[in-house]
A protein has these predicted regions:
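Short, intrinsically disordered terminal tails adjacent to the first/last structured region
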Residues: 1-41, 566-577
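Membrane-proximal helix-loop-helix interfaces that form the catalytic/acceptor-binding platform
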Residues: 24-27, 31, 39, 43-386, ...
Length: 577
């Protein structure tokens, strides 16, 4: 009996065990069904089409230049005026991020200015490279159409497209884990010890740029160690494997001691409370089965689509079908590549050190193997269908069509609504018109970012949209080359406008504001005060989350003698804790 697509792959029985293990990924279909599937050249053309579609989808998302949304702003506000050394300190707005990612983002800002494009450049480049690298890895792990399914899922998955154009470290988490996976797979095929040296040399970069990279590195190291034990690895392989693990441990200790400990000490309690629902209930083990089921049927497996509240149930079913095939055929290497990193992740979550589930961003490091597992599950589903007389050719075409429609739908949505929320779009539109317009007619100063005046202190310590306001201001200052307020130019015809942002959820320090106004009145006459209200709405653009206000205080000289500009250094000291 022939496998219905084994003949489509280039795998030969004389190749390594990794290649031979891909034979079982096919199904048991007859020769007639085998002939009904696309030939090898057609599969290659389809694979190239999906890769190019993935590049196009990511490029469109990046080019559309979505407004920064709140989660991006919380992190990006730290790149406005912090130095590289200051990024080693606790970050503002309860943020934690690996230091090498912070430094690369800061370097991009210094090179290209503070803008949406520069802030998202590193994730975008990482994502494009990942597409081609994943295609290579998938071809090493899977045969024929399974390769196509894996690459297609990876190319059209919403999380992969989204994090290609988002100024957060989750796209680089996936990229670095994929690089490690690629090196392990190449080592297993060729048994070249130098690849283990490459893994060792990668550890300082990977663990310094990605927190979950330690899960991938640790899990893959366990897989390589088990292979060396089972196959009696050479002395050189053992030496290089030990060297890899030594650099892994040293890199983790150094980066944690330098940055991780500082961030954890500052934000550990807040993050633990914020993500407490995403830690497994190890003290209530009777709840664990339901928790695991719901977690994996929700955000953790949101590929190519999915989300909270069981929205990823179909993906979970495909993954379970794939796991069933892996277990039935005793493909322990495959199981190790997937379950090793995820198992360490789960252990960290059980210790309440890193959330498991709750959002797809936390499983980005595992996305390559999840997409491969989904492909195996699709293979199993098509094999089951073929046993009941369904045409393999039609099933294959149906799967490819569905995946293409998913990708096309995502691109269409981005083109129609190039923003995360309408409130984000309105906030950026206001910044673009307000800051440029006022700078032409007046001397303008943002009280917080330009002068370091903080009259609503809580909004700059908590997760508020003040970060959004400050980032949009910094973007417009750089984009339009707006200069700081020059008090020597203030006159009756060119007044001084002082701008204050406030979030209605946080209390205004009225006494401090009145004191500042009294001080300003000694030198200037307050000729107007206007407050522009903005409703901050939820993603559905219906539910009111809070009211935001942009207050403007307009002054003209009282006696014609301008005062000195307040020291700029106060801004960074006030923003940083």
């Amino acid at each position: 009996m022939k496998y219905w697509w084994f003949w489509l792959s280039e795998v030969q029985p004389t190749m390594t065990e990794l290649n031979r293990s891909s034979v079982w990924l096919s199904g048991d279909a007859g020769e007639a069904e085998t002939k009904s599937t696309p030939d090898h050249a057609s599969l290659n053309r389809l694979l190239i089409c999906f890769v190019l579609f993935g590049v196009l989808a990511r490029a469109i998302r990046y080019y559309l230049c979505f407004p920064l949304w709140d989660d991006e702003s919380f992190l990006c506000v730290n790149f406005i005026d912090r130095s590289f050394a200051e990024l080693l300190q606790p970050l503002d707005f309860h943020q934690v991020a690996p230091v090498l990612f912070l430094w690369t983002e800061r370097a991009a800002v210094k090179l290209f200015g503070f803008s949406e494009y520069s802030l998202r450049l590193i994730p975008f480049v990482s994502s494009i490279i990942s597409l081609f690298l994943f295609s290579r890895v998938a071809q090493r792990l899977l045969p024929g159409p399974a390769v196509l399914f894996a690459v297609a899922v990876f190319s059209v998955s919403y999380p992969q497209i989204r994090y290609a154009a988002e100024a957060k470290p989750y796209g680089t988490d996936m990229f670095l884990s994929l690089v490690m996976l690629s090196l392990v797979v190449e080592w297993y095929q060729h048994r070249n010890p130098r690849l283990l040296i490459g893994l060792a040399l990668l550890m300082p970069v990977a663990l310094g740029a990605s927190y979950p990279a330690v899960f991938a590195a640790g899990g893959l190291s366990l897989v390589v160690g088990s292979v060396l034990l089972r196959q009696k690895g050479t002395a050189a392989e053992w030496q290089f494997w030990i060297f890899w693990n030594v650099t892994l441990v040293i890199s983790f200790v150094v980066w944690f001691g330098l940055v991780g400990r500082v961030q954890s000490g500052a934000e550990g309690e807040f993050m633990g409370e914020y993500w407490k629902q995403n830690f497994p209930p190890v003290r209530q083990p009777w709840l664990l089965p339901y928790w695991l089921l719901k977690t994996h049927a929700s955000d953790f497996l949101a590929y190519p689509l999915g989300g909270p509240n069981w929205a990823s149930t179909l993906t979970l079913c495909l993954c379970l079908a794939g796991l069933w095939r892996l277990v039935a055929q005793k493909q322990f290497l495959w199981l190790g590549l997937l379950l090793g990193p995820v198992g360490l992740h789960f252990l960290a979550a059980a210790l309440q050190k890193y959330p498991y589930g709750g959002h797809v961003k936390f499983s980005q490091y595992a996305a390559p193997m999840i997409c491969c597992l989904i492909a195996v599950g699709i293979v199993q589903l098509l094999d089951w269908r073929s046993r009941y007389g369904y045409s393999m050719k039609h099933s294959f075409a149906w799967v490819c069509s569905v995946l293409f429609v998913i990708g096309l739908g995502g691109v269409s949505r981005d083109l129609i609504n190039p923003y995360k929320t309408r409130s984000d779009d309105r906030a950026r539109a206001f910044a673009r018109s307000f800051w440029v317009g006022t700078h032409f007619a007046e001397e303008v100063a943002c009280l917080k970012s330009d002068w370091g005046k903080d009259f609503v202190p809580e909004q700059h310590r908590e997760l508020s949209w003040s970060a959004h306001f400050l980032c949009n201001h910094a973007i417009e200052v750089g984009r339009s080359h707006l200069r700081p307020a020059d008090l020597s130019r203030v006159s009756a015809t060119r007044p001084l406008r002082c701008v204050l942002y406030r979030d209605a959820r946080y209390e205004l320090d009225q006494a401090k504001l009145d004191s500042w106004l009294d001080d300003m009145r000694q030198r200037y006459e307050l000729v107007s005060h206007e407050s522009i209200p903005f409703p901050r709405l939820a993603k559905n653009d219906r539910r009111l989350v809070t009211m935001e206000y942009v207050d403007s205080y307009k002054f003209v000289p009282r006696d014609g003698v301008p005062s000195e500009l307040p020291p700029m250094a106060d801004s960074r000291k006030t923003l940083s804790r």
